[in-house]
Design a protein with these regions (language model features):
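Short beta-strand-turn/beta-hairpin segments enriched in glycine/proline and small hydrophobics
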Residues: 23, 29-32
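Short, aromatic/basic amphipathic alpha-helical patches
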Residues: 179, 259-260, 284-292, 307-323
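A composition-driven surface/loop motif
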Residues: 7-20, 26
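Structural signature of tandem-repeat unit edges
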Residues: 1-12, 33-49, 58-72, 81-95, ...
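Consensus positions within tandem repeat domains that build extended binding/scaffold surfaces
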Residues: 31, 51-54, 74-77, 98-100, ...
Length: 328
């Protein structure tokens, strides 16, 4: 069900089944007055596939009955269904895209038949059948308790608009990129006994290698703690805000990997402070179209190290795109 004949993955525009144009990147959910009275959708049992944005923009939708033959719930399939408060997922489910229920901020109750061979639901969390991987969190939950069986939290798992508090279980050891990229998330706790990750100040980090996993903004600022040694695009999330006004990077940070500045974004009028006497090592695939150091803002460095940081920026072909200042 849905439009696919002329629309490709990654297109900015797409259509719902009623012809409403959807542009997720710019907040257009496809709503039209012509389908404002639709409150229930029943997908026939013969349907095996949904297309992206198929039922996006049904803002008054309250009930959905999905075909149990559906294996994948694609991106923005029910984007903007603001009154949808519960859903029973199909028992053939193998994959759910993180934006499948984007902006469904009332969706708190999720159920799934025990007959599903690949997944199960607990605490509003969609898990792998063995409980070790967290794939997705119901987007209407304000408080999330990650089950103790979970070890891996997948990309964008709890990146929604309403979550304010997350409690991580004892076995969580792997948190993927943007897992907790939520502007209202102010509080992340870790249960006692976790041997791999820890919290200090505004940071959730890996105790074994010092990689920052989640930065929690406070007053639009993030001060990275001295336990952190590495910023890595593959695992990093910023919680509590979209754009920081100040980011402090301590001397303990020795490595910057990939496009980490896209994970922790600082506003163009903001400031970044590098406190290390030596600039961190820059890693990542060589891509001339990508800059792996902060640009288009003010960057503050130790006065005695100004020349070193200038050489560092020059080596990245980025010196002309940054305003370097010294820490007083």
């Amino acid at each position: 069900i849905g439009h696919s004949y002329s629309l490709n993955k990654g297109d900015e525009f797409n259509c719902n089944v009623f012809g409403g144009w959807v542009e997720y990147a710019h907040g257009v959910d496809g709503y039209k007055d012509t389908f404002k009275n639709i409150e229930k959708v029943v997908i026939p049992s013969k349907v095996t596939q949904l297309e992206d944005t198929a039922f996006a923009g049904l803002r008054n939708l309250k009930k959905v009955i999905l075909s149990d033959a559906i294996t994948v719930i694609p991106g923005e399939a029910f984007y903007g269904c603001k009154r949808l408060s519960s859903i029973t997922l199909p028992k053939s489910l193998t994959t759910i895209e993180h934006t499948a229920f984007a902006d469904c901020n009332a969706l708190k109750k999720v159920t799934l038949s025990s007959e599903c061979r690949t997944m199960k639901v607990k605490n509003g969390c969609l898990l792998s059948k063995n409980g070790r991987t967290l794939w997705w969190v119901a987007p209407g939950l304000k408080k999330v308790t990650v089950p103790d069986t979970v070890r891996v939290i997948k990309e964008y798992a709890a990146a929604n608009k309403v979550v304010t508090k997350v409690t991580l279980g004892k076995k969580v050891s792997d948190i993927r990129t943007f897992a907790f990229q939520s502007r209202k998330l102010k509080d992340i706790q870790i249960k006692k006994g976790n041997k791999t990750i820890a919290k200090k100040g505004q940071c959730i980090y890996n105790k074994k290698n010092g990689t920052l996993l989640v930065g929690i903004a406070k007053n639009k600022k993030l001060k990275i703690c001295s336990k952190v040694k590495k910023l890595d695009e593959q695992v990093l999330s910023l919680a509590g805000i979209r754009y920081l006004v100040r980011l402090d990077i301590p001397s303990s940070v020795k490595t910057l990997n990939g496009r980490w500045t896209e994970n922790i974004e600082v506003s163009s009028s903001g400031k970044i402070f590098f406190h290390g006497a030596e600039p961190p090592r820059v890693m990542g695939a060589v891509d001339e179209s990508v800059c792996y150091v902060p640009i288009f803002l003010k960057v503050y460095v130790p006065k005695k190290s100004l020349k070193k940081y200038k050489r560092w920026y020059k080596a990245q072909d980025a010196l002309s795109y940054v305003t370097l200042k010294t820490i007083s």
